[in-house]
Amino acid sequence: MFQSCLPGALRSWSRGVFSTSTRPRLVLGIETSCDETGAAVLDETGRILGESLHSQKETHLKTGGIIPLVAQRLHRENISRVVQEALNRSAIEPSELTAVATTVKPGLALSLGIGLDYSLKFVRQHQKPFIPIHHMEAHALTVRMLHPLDFPFLVLLVSGGHSLLALAKGIDEFLLLGQTLDEAAGDTLDKIARRLSLRNHPECGTLSGGQAIERLAKEGDRLAFHFISPMGQNYDCNFSFAGLRTQITGAINKKEKEEGVEAGQFLSCVKDIAAASQHTVASHLAKRTHRAILFCKSKGLLPEQNPTLIVSGGVASNEYIRQILKIITDATGLHLLCPPSKFCTDNGVMIAWNGIERLKQGKGILSYSEEVSYEPKAPLGLDITSEVKEAAIKVPKLKLRTNS
């Protein structure tokens, strides 16, 4: 946990950080946890004054996945430009900033290091407070920038690197209800897309793996293949996608032999496999989320008025998965909120907003002279997954069908 500065260290800049002046405080957010170099300037109302984002997606599509050394090099080449663009678009000088917020955990070590090194040099040069940010906390709280939402609320975070369920009780207080035991949902969808050679598909050349699956699934028959939803007899909220990917890979291998398809060619049923894969991933996410809702209700952890499920992270951009989750929230009386797709994927805006949240409450604000380290692995909140498992809540069956 990050320690706030001692009063003596705060003296030189506390007036600006904790000022009651009517002039809005401004935070520069910097994101480099994986393969997006992002920066944004926000005021304390959540107004985006300027932002910039450099995506490495096209490079990593060509290499078949994220190579940490390549990601590091691209962050190094682009971070100065991206930050300067965000400042220029906001018409804000560094001297006008109240603080700088940067992702320091979790993520790829080499990527985190670029963002942290740049940020520490920046805050020392301009003598600005530094706010270290937990990447998953930022995803969880992004929706509060767009909607008036009080704590507590349930959060499902699904991306290429993470799949977890947590109860958000405060800006830095979370209860971890479930997490992936192997690979994340987004990683699974990306690997299935690579196995299907969707990079070469005429409809999918510029899309990420998950986006390609979603695109083709719209014209596929999800009932053409039956994949077993993982962990059906495990009454907890953890996720597991590796076994599902093995099932799907087996089906692809079988069909390739039947059709005589060689590597790089497409199966005639590629859209059906995409649809069935997407549905099974969505179903697994939905069932674990359903149990998390029932657990939270049984323990009185959700408010009676306007209980809410937030879905964020890159996979939350998938409209089909959102629709399946809406079936669960409708059945359990929860309100479903998802950030716009542009804020589901990694960006500087969510980091700046998390900095604003911390600034308002005076939490985790460090002096520019303090030493900070990045953490490639970092849990989210207090782990109560064993308590969830002990509750052994059985989830009633629901028909997970959509109109699309």
Swiss-Prot record:
Q: Provide the protein's localization.
A: Mitochondrion
GO cellular component: a single term = mitochondrion
* Catalysed conversion reaction: L-threonylcarbamoyladenylate + adenosine(37) in tRNA = N(6)-L-threonylcarbamoyladenosine(37) in tRNA + AMP + H(+)
Q: Name one GO molecular function term.
A: N(6)-L-threonylcarbamoyladenine synthase activity
Residues that bind a divalent metal cation: H135, H139, D346
Does tRNA processing show up as a keyword for this record?
yes
Q: Name one GO biological process term.
A: tRNA threonylcarbamoyladenosine modification
What EC number(s) would the UniProt record show? Answer: 2.3.1.234
- The primary site where this protein sits is mitochondrion
Keywords on this record? Answer: Acyltransferase, Metal-binding, Mitochondrion, Transferase, Transit peptide, tRNA processing
The UniProt record lists the keyword Disulfide bond: no
Where along this sequence does the record place binding of substrate? L157, V158, S159, G160, G161, D190, G210, E214, S317, N318, T345
* Pfam families (alphabetical): TsaD
SUPFAM superfamilies membership: Actin-like ATPase domain
Cofactor annotation comment: Binds 1 divalent metal cation per subunit.
Identify which cofactors the protein needs according to its UniProt entry: a divalent metal cation
Can you state the subunit structure given in the record?
Answer: Monomer.
Write out the similarity annotation: Belongs to the KAE1 / TsaD family.
Q: What is this protein called?
A: tRNA N6-adenosine threonylcarbamoyltransferase, mitochondrial
- Annotated organism of origin: Danio rerio
